[in-house]
């Protein structure tokens, strides 16, 4: 019995060797058709172009959503009129991404300036395990203020 156990253990031990082979690199493949844009002008406050793969949902004249079902993403847009309250709107826009600071590893900012059209803004990339990975605001500093998040 002792020899049988020893020989069985030896056979199992020697038969469990395998040659290690390197695994090929895997890449994420996202196939989306070429983007085709259409104008969105249903709100009196602002207009923009969006991809026709998105579905637009209008909650009211100030809030709307762009839903991309194939990408499982939603872009939330919130419009505010500027009425001598640009400071408070900017403070709120800067506070919003930093609500995720407990889950975020970092929140780099990217400033957007288009002096020809008078549009200014900031894009916040929330790196880490946060509910909203990208947040931004755009304004002309006079009449319009748009906040968005993905």
Residue ranges and their predicted role:
Residues 1-17:
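Sec-dependent bacterial lipoprotein signal peptides
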Residues 16-73, 81-90, 99, 105-116, ...:
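N-terminal targeting sequences that direct proteins away from the cytosol to non-cytosolic compartments
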Residues 119-135:
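Short, Gly/Ser/Thr-enriched beta-strand-loop segments that form substrate-interacting elements
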Residues 136-138, 147-148:
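Short, hydrophobic/aromatic-rich beta-strand segments within well-structured domains
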